[in-house]
């Protein structure tokens, strides 16, 4: 009887071993997410027929370029080019940013944060002196135009870039250029961003 019990126990051991729950297989590792691919920058626009010198604006957010329209706004373009060549805009900050509308710069007060309450009120001290409103150069997306406080002839050093077409401004402000490269940069500008350098493209 004892022998029979021992034999039965010995025979049951292999069955007990194989009856154990198999160890869980390791789960396959989840695939690593792919790094996001940056969208390519928009291709530069072709210069407009009759366009003049191109002005490069290097900012803390990147660089954009705009063509000028000396045929339609000769006095304005001459005035802006003179300011650019004497480095008037270097170190100035963008003092006005309205998303989907405009970005604006050109006030020397913006070099000084203690004068922030005066940002947008100053210029070079020498206005253009002539209103050169044009029916040809309109406020399309990327237009560059002169800011003023009521009289286009008194526009001085402040200019703005339209972030979308703004036809309601046509005939009220002198459009003297258009962004042809780096339009995506203009949409990233915020109040306080600095113009590191502004120069005429060789």
Residue positions per predicted region:
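Bacterial N-terminal signal peptides that target proteins for export
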Residues: 1-7
């Amino acid at each position: 009887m004892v022998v029979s019990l021992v034999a039965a126990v010995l025979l049951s051991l292999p069955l007990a071993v194989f009856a154990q729950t198999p160890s869980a297989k390791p789960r396959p590792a989840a695939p690593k997410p792919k790094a996001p691919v940056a969208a390519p920058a928009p291709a530069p626009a072709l210069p407009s027929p009759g366009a003049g010198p191109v002005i490069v604006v290097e900012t803390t957010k990147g660089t954009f370029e705009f063509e000028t329209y000396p045929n339609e706004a000769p006095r304005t373009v001459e005035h802006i080019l003179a300011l650019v060549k004497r480095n008037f805009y270097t170190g100035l900050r963008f003092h006005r940013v309205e998303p989907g509308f405009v970005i604006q710069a050109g006030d020397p007060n913006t070099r000084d944060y203690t004068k922030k309450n005066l940002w947008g009120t100053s210029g070079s001290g020498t206005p253009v002196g002539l209103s050169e409103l044009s029916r040809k150069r309109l406020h399309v997306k990327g237009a560059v135009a002169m800011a003023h406080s009521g009289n286009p002839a008194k526009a001085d050093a402040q200019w703005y870039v339209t972030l979308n077409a703004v036809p309601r401004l046509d005939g009220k402000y002198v459009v003297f250029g258009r962004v042809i490269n780096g339009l995506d940069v203009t949409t990233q500008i915020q109040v306080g961003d600095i113009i590191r350098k502004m120069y005429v493209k060789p």
